Amino acid sequence: MFQKQERIGLVVYLYYNRDARKLSKFGDLYYHSKRSRYLIIYINKNDLDTKLEEMRRLKCVKDIRPSAFDDIDRQFVGNLHRDETNNHQKG
């Protein structure tokens, strides 16, 4: 049966757009902004450390930023109510 794998998005900034094809071997290339010269690549969380190390060694990569999606609170129902009660308790 199909197993869902944990994945993480990486924003990879490039020096030149022509080097985008070199990074497609590391994961699924989701978006390429030619104007701002960055890519969004999704890779498996298991391979994160090794692939980051390999990508940072490339001369075409300027910067790599992992996605903060896991750190964001995604419980939207009742968010305003929770914020109001926290502010009243502090003040």
Swiss-Prot record:
GO CC list: cytoplasm
Main location: cytoplasm
Protein localization: Cytoplasm
Alphabetical list of InterPro entries matching this protein: DUF2129
UniProt keyword list: Cytoplasm
Tree of life domain: Bacteria
Record flagged with keyword ATP-binding: no
Keyword flag Cytoplasm: yes
NCBIfam families in alphabetical order: PRK02302.1
The family this protein is said to belong to: Belongs to the UPF0298 family.
HAMAP family membership: UPF0298
Protein name: UPF0298 protein SPy_0397/M5005_Spy0329
